[in-house]
Amino acid sequence: MQRNHIVKSLLITGLFTTSSLPLLAAEAPKNATAATQQANNLLYNQLPFSDNTDFTDAHKGFIAPIPQDVIKGEQGNVIWDPQQYAFIKEGDKAPDTVNPSLWRQAQLINISGLFEVTDGVYQIRNLDLSNMTIIEGKEGITVVDPLVSAETAKVGMDLYYKNRGQKPVVAVIYTHSHVDHYGGVRGVIDEADVKSGKVKIYAPAGLLEEAVSENIMAGNVMSRRASYMYGNLLKPDVKGQVGAGLGTTTSAGTVTLIAPTNYITKTGQKETIDGLTYDFLMAPGSEAPSEMLWFIEEKKLIETAEDVTHTLHNTYSLRGAKIRQPLPWSKYINEALNLWGDKAEIILAQHHWPTWGNDNVVKLLKSQRDLYRYINDQTLRMANQGMTRDEIAANFKLPSSLANTWANRGYYGSVSHDVKATYVLYLGWFDGNPATLDELPPEEGAKKFVEYMGGADAILQKAKQDYDQGNFRWVAQVVSKVVFADPNNQAARNLEADALEQLGYQAESGPWRNFYLTGAQELRNGVQKLPTPNTASPDTVRAMTPEMFFDYLAVHINGEKAADAKAVLNFDFGEDGGTYKVELENGVLNHTAGVEASNADATITLSRDVLNKIVLKEETLKEATDKGDVKITGNVEKLNELLGYMDNFEFWFNIVTP
């Protein structure tokens, strides 16, 4: 198991604790059944496996390999192992336990190194989940999206310097607000150079707020689910994790963030960055809440961030996130096509590999544009015919012109869950049938389900027959009821695990495979409580506004315990943070900026720097108070009372069991 890769994925996670916990003896994964082998083999006749264009493009411009040394942290923890996917070899036929289409994608994303995209534009691939792009200009270099971790980003820069010479970084660009596109920035530049004006950081409007806020309120649950989505609990091998579809996996180093100095605010905004002309296109609410694309005139290059890649992307992330809107997404791509399609010779994204040649550029833009538009429009067409979310997903088919294009295959997103997300985007979770309006909760409903079906043994006997016939979806669905009715029924857990495992072996989507196989692993062996990550890096905490901080506290208030409590507190953060009135009443914590209550129970005075240290657990409130860094006047017990109503979130909560 990869202890050091737990939960870093695409979130604001920070450093791991140093404690080590024992693992249970794990039951080994099983082989692919005949039904799974048959399902996977059918794909060879359905998809154009003879088309090797992507492999040619993925190798084009190769300069140097990624260093093969394991990247480790100060405590010896593995941050990135370049050899962990060495079992995925280009040219090998897919194993029985991996969907052939996903295997092909895994081979492609495993192609790593420093590449020349065009004269003066270079890209480092497979040193993290995302790519890092380096653009040579008049005075130095501009770095686009410095990976997840400072450690991997530094190795990437060293690789570039070794092959292209030492050049000063004059600018950094964040394409959007996800952590794999800014987290390694301190491995690329020094913040002092940003403050002095030596280095500029460009970003789309709203990036800093979105980077901090998107995951922080639901950070614990999103991180736990991310451990499923990215397969961080699985061993990388042919019966385990083979990649995430978007990249191989995430690094497990230090997430950093330096605030942008220059914001792009509107489509058509042009900036000269180190002698090159950038024409920007805003794309908020597409793949990320804050995102932008651009065209470099001198290079005839479209940078599509993460809106045009070599996969059907998520319009909903299985780790949990706000639903993304396929219609605006499609329109942004159409706008890029109309603005630059007649002159672009290259499409470059921050995942996967570039596309060269105007005809190919236009073809890819049109195909991805129509992919997201088709999902939007046809979901609504079918919904307007009275079909429900699950009925639409079960009957939804892309036209062959879209479905048989490799770049549109569901390696990260999937047609099924993107369609369901689009339904929920417009119509919400309720399907309109009053029988589903107030269903029993999972455990209670499962017990009645098992009772009505004649008991667990009867269900398992029938389910085993369905398993032998290859009906794995139904087996997983029905046996999950038995597990939720009696989580100690190991026979049920094992049968559900077997079914999930076969579904994982058949899955084309990397996240689907990872969810299935992680669920199977936890059903068989229980939840392995590995070292727990902090859910916010120091830079993320420092970037939180006071409003975000108080909202974060409010999420931790146990409303039932605090239902009858009342407290009014003033917080004074000084010149760098302002004053806030905080009120606890009706189990709710409200705050008001710029106001001090005359009837406050207590006033807490501290600097923003001290607040950051307390949030990061670098010191306790008591320690800071004893040192005089926190001053409390009034009724101290009211503050203690408020803090006593706050829940601590258990990270390793159950997912496949109650």
Regions found by a protein language model. Name each.
Residues 107-167, 291-296, 300-306:
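Conserved beta-strand hairpin/beta-sheet module of binuclear metal-dependent hydrolase folds
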Residues 140-151, 252, 256-262, 268-385:
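Metallo-beta-lactamase
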Residues 25, 471-477, 484, 488, ...:
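Feature captures hydrophobic
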Residues 1-26:
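Gram-negative bacterial Sec-dependent N-terminal signal peptides
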Residues 28-40, 301, 311, 327-391, ...:
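Divalent-metal (often Zn2+) His-rich catalytic cores of metallo-beta-lactamase-fold enzymes
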Residues 139-140, 150-200, 483:
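Active-site metal-binding motif and surrounding structural segment of the metallo-beta-lactamase
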Residues 446-478:
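Alpha-helical segment of the N-proximal tetratricopeptide repeat
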